[in-house]
Every structure is written in structure tokens, then in C-alpha cells.
Amino acid sequence: MSRLQQLQAFLAQDPNDSFTRYAIGLEYAKAQDYTAAIRTLEELRTIDADYVPTYLMLGGYYREVNDTANAEAIYKEGLLRARKSSDLHAASELQAALDELDDQ
């Protein structure tokens, strides 16, 4: 059983587990299936909008498919949520990603 299959089995047992859904998105991206990665992290964003790690990765995956408009919107939303939850490290990473996007 692959890591992705294991994670999917875990998610089937607990569909509300944000970390597992996030990890599935990362596995798809690892396989360069950015469409599936984006779909998975968008689902996570709908289910648990306050799961801050989602935003940096999701924005990056939008960049991988050359969708800079969505990447920018995701980074900005993540920045707001990170600040709201006082996650200064995530806010810093999201701001850096946004700045890098603006420099392109």
C-alpha cells in the first residue's frame, strides 16, 4: 500500500482530519499531480478554513500551474488567517511568498 493509499484510508476513517487531508494534498504534489493537489487543498480550505498551513502550499501549487491570480488571492487570505491566529511564522512565510509573486 502506497503512502497516498494509507493516507486515504486514514481519511476515510476520519473525514474531518485536517492534517491527513493536507498530507494527501502534499502527496499529490510530490507526484506532480497539481490538479489533484489543488482540489484536495481547496476541499480542506472549505472544510477547515483556519488550517493555516494550507495557504502557503495551495498558493504554491497554483503557481506551479501558472495561475498567479489564484496564488495571490490564496496567499492574501492565508496571511489574514495567520495574523488572526497569531501565527507569526506562517504570516512571515506567506508574506515572503506574496512578495516573491509581486516581484515576478
Task: Please name every model-derived segment.
Residues 9-12, 43-46, 80:
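Conserved structural position within tetratricopeptide repeats
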